[in-house]
């Protein structure tokens, strides 16, 4: 079995892009949500260095045309859709290019969550399960054990308050295909603590 995917979100500085990639991140997230303290302009994201890790844009309220335009300008590989976009929107971006966020706490049962995710079969590359009922980057965690029985038709990433002290437990219990790290590996919003990043990614990759 291959090692879980590791995404580090909220890139704002060149040294964090390079440091996270060197630590073993597979995906790096660039946020284009105006309400986020980690928000970048497309030009700012475009100016950050290219590394081996794939570049992911995080979008909440943008139109399809805006998403596609920013992806082109900032040279992004994937779009993480965090605004409840429907399957048609995802297909228009490109199923192989989309990570779509879901919020388990919006659902009364695991079956309800699974049904929503099933509607996106063939429309997205990865699902991402985040804490809360909207948005992300708030540092809250999901109930790992409650997700252990989830078997959606696509690979999924776990997000929400993950860092060096709980990411190994999250992987062991919830069994996602990967994890998304943000506030749990920061010294302040948008500024990564590379020691926390390295400790977290060692746990993810089993180094």
What residue spans do the PLM features occupy?
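Conserved N-terminal beta1-alpha1 strand-loop-helix module at the mouth
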Residues: 1-207
């Amino acid at each position: 079995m291959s090692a879980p995917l590791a995404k580090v979100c909220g890139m704002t500085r060149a040294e964090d892009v390079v440091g996270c990639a060197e630590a073993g991140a597979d995906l790096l997230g660039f946020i284009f949500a105006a309400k986020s303290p980690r928000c970048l302009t497309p030009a700012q994201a475009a100016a950050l260095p290219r590394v081996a890790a794939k570049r992911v844009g995080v979008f909440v309220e943008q139109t399809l045309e805006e998403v596609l335009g920013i992806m082109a300008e900032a040279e992004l590989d994937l779009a993480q859709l965090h605004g409840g976009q429907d399957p048609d929107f995802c297909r228009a971006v490109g199923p192989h290019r989309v990570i779509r966020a879901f919020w388990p706490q919006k659902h009364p049962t695991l079956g309800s969550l699974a049904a929503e995710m099933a509607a996106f079969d063939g429309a997205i590359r990865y699902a991402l399960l985040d804490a809360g009922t909207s948005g992300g980057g708030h540092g809250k965690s999901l109930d790992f054990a409650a997700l252990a029985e989830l078997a959606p038709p696509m690979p999924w990433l776990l997000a929400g308050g993950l860092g060096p002290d709980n990411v190994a437990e999250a992987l062991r219990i919830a069994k996602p295909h990967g994890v998304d790290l943000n506030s749990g590996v920061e010294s302040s919003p948008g500024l990564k603590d590379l020691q926390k990043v390295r400790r977290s990614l060692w746990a993810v990759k089993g180094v």
